[in-house]
């Protein structure tokens, strides 16, 4: 059985969006742009959640994204951490 130091999660979060071109204010869409990110939560504070895509046997990690917690809409655990 392999050990997993970090759980694997799926995060649905409201991302910022940009638009271009001439438009009037009435045509602007108020719908959230929902992004989906899957990764290993390697740090969490009151304001942010850091996910890494990869970690090694010494628990060093790479390819991180820092998501503001106020933008998180749903968090699903896909695989729980396992201690060896």
Task: State what each model feature region is.
Residues 1-84:
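Conserved RNA-binding domains used in RNP assembly and mRNA/RNA metabolism
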């Amino acid at each position: 059985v392999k050990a997993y130091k970090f759980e694997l999660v799926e995060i649905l979060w409201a991302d910022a969006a940009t638009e271009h071109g001439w438009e009037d204010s009435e045509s602007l869409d108020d719908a959230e742009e929902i992004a989906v990110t899957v990764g290993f939560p390697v740090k969490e504070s009151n304001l942010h959640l850091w996910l890494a895509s990869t970690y090694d046997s010494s628990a060093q990690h790479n390819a991180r994204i820092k998501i503001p917690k106020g933008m998180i809409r749903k968090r699903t655990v896909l695989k729980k951490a396992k201690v060896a």
